[in-house]
Amino acid sequence: MLADEVIELLGQEISKNEMENYISQIKFNEKSSNSENIIFTAPNELVTKFIQTRYANKIANIFEVKTGIKPVISITTQKNRVSIKAKDIDVKQIRTQSSLLNPSYTFESFVVGDSNQFAYISSQQAAQNPGKVYNPLFIYGSTGLGKTHLLQSIGNYCLEHGKTVICVTSEQFMSDFIRNVENRTMNKFKEKYRNCDILLIDDIQFFHKSEKTQEEFFHTFNEIHAKKGQIVMTSDKPPKMLKGFEERLKSRFEWGLMADITPPELDTKIRIIKAKCEFDGINLSSDIIEYIATNMGDNIREIESAIININAFANIMRQEITLEFAKNVIKDQIKEKKDNISLENIISCVSHEMNIKPSDIKSKSRTKGIVEARRICIYLAKTLTPNSMPQLATHFGLKDHSAVSHNIKKINEIINNDGYFKARVEELKNKITSKE
């Protein structure tokens, strides 16, 4: 049957995990299908939504190759299931409570570059040797750089190897905690979170909202760690920079390994875009890919959103995806920050965060804190604005462009040798760009 051939070909392009857990569960609805409308039936809403979102277009492309006609792919949910057979029960669901795990987030699907290589290797080793190395593992970096992908890659790997995995956001942990306190069912809460092999907490920085939650997580952390269970957390900043956290909790975050993810370089962004296009069966020319990589920001989710929007508009309007078409579709998403960010905005933000006067930055003061703030401003100004070296020299009261270059070089040297300083500069950059 043609549908079987298509599914078999799809299986050659995706991971074994996804094939077994999702694609193998759908059935071709021959009675309701025709050459232009292909219908598959899935056993539940989870599988339906996942396949419709991730694979419908790829399945349609394979049908087009086989028949010359690109059909509309529909995934419907099987209804009126009277009984559940033993073989229908997914053991992984039993082992994964309150799980956010997305099976497409694997180590194999993660695009590695200089900006994330250390975090990637650390995550792999923590997954392969849970509780034995890098425990806890603390992954930090700005929004949309791949922290959640690595966190869930660890979860999916450990799940495949028979471990009990809990994967939740900090908000979910807090909500679960509050609900169990109100219901007086804390024994149930403790049994759930303290008896797992792997505890994964995404965006742990939001624990600052609740001292009671921090207290509970402190004891949860201690018990899991004592039992040699693996703990992995993600955050937008390193432990030392977390505000509103107890020192004893921050110190535990530093017990193991801290791995940062920085904004991807152009080459990595290009490879990420190509991987996304291949995964979703989207055909973009090299000039479009380079345009997206060069002009979008560093947030990978925003880049992927741009790709999805381009493809969706092309399908709806039945147009060929050209560079001009792509530019028009994502023009509102493009991060044209350089023309919008002023030098005064940078000085204002840096001086506020470093608790000095804006006038001090332009002064001749050689006080250590002021010199550092001035250098950070110059570094960010060169990174975020179109101003030339001579223009920056004039604005900051420096002798000439070589003095600007010297200040930028000093900041780069510190960034390369001090992870904490690097995170501070990155946080300042994010605050400046997010205000625009």
Curated annotation (Swiss-Prot):
For region Domain I, interacts with DnaA modulators, the annotated ranges are 1-69
Q: Which UniProt keywords apply?
A: ATP-binding, Cytoplasm, DNA replication, DNA-binding, Lipid-binding, Nucleotide-binding
- SMART domains (UniProt xref): AAA, Bac_DnaA_C
What SUPFAM superfamilies does this protein map onto?
A: P-loop containing nucleoside triphosphate hydrolases (SSF52540), TrpR-like (SSF48295)
Q: Which GO terms describe its molecular function?
A: ATP binding; ATP hydrolysis activity; DNA replication origin binding; lipid binding
What cellular-component terms does GO give this entry? Answer: cytoplasm; plasma membrane
- Compartment(s) where it occurs, according to its Swiss-Prot or TrEMBL record: Cytoplasm
Gene3D superfamilies listed in its UniProt record? 1.10.1750.10, 1.10.8.60, 3.30.300.180, P-loop containing nucleotide triphosphate hydrolases (3.40.50.300)
Which CDD domains does the protein's record reference?
AAA, Bac_DnaA_C
Q: Mention any Pfam family matching this sequence.
A: Bac_DnaA
* Region described as Domain IV, binds dsDNA: 315-436
Annotated region Domain II: the residues are 69-99
Positions of the UniProt region annotated as Domain III, AAA+ region: 100-314
The processes (GO biological process) annotated in the record are: DNA replication initiation; regulation of DNA replication
In this chain, ATP is annotated as bound at: G144, G146, K147, T148
Quick check: keyword Disulfide bond in the entry? Answer: no
Spell out the PANTHER family in the cross-references.
CHROMOSOMAL REPLICATION INITIATOR PROTEIN DNAA
Q: How does it assemble?
A: Oligomerizes as a right-handed, spiral filament on DNA at oriC.
Q: What does this protein do, in the record's words?
A: Plays an essential role in the initiation and regulation of chromosomal replication. ATP-DnaA binds to the origin of replication (oriC) to initiate formation of the DNA replication initiation complex once per cell cycle. Binds the DnaA box (a 9 base pair repeat at the origin) and separates the double-stranded (ds)DNA. Forms a right-handed helical filament on oriC DNA; dsDNA binds to the exterior of the filament while single-stranded (ss)DNA is stabiized in the filament's interior.
Stated family: Belongs to the DnaA family.
NCBIfam families, per database record: DnaA
* Notes on the domains: Domain I is involved in oligomerization and binding regulators, domain II is flexibile and of varying length in different bacteria, domain III forms the AAA+ region, while domain IV binds dsDNA.
Name assigned to this protein: Chromosomal replication initiator protein DnaA
Q: Quick one: which gene encodes this?
A: dnaA
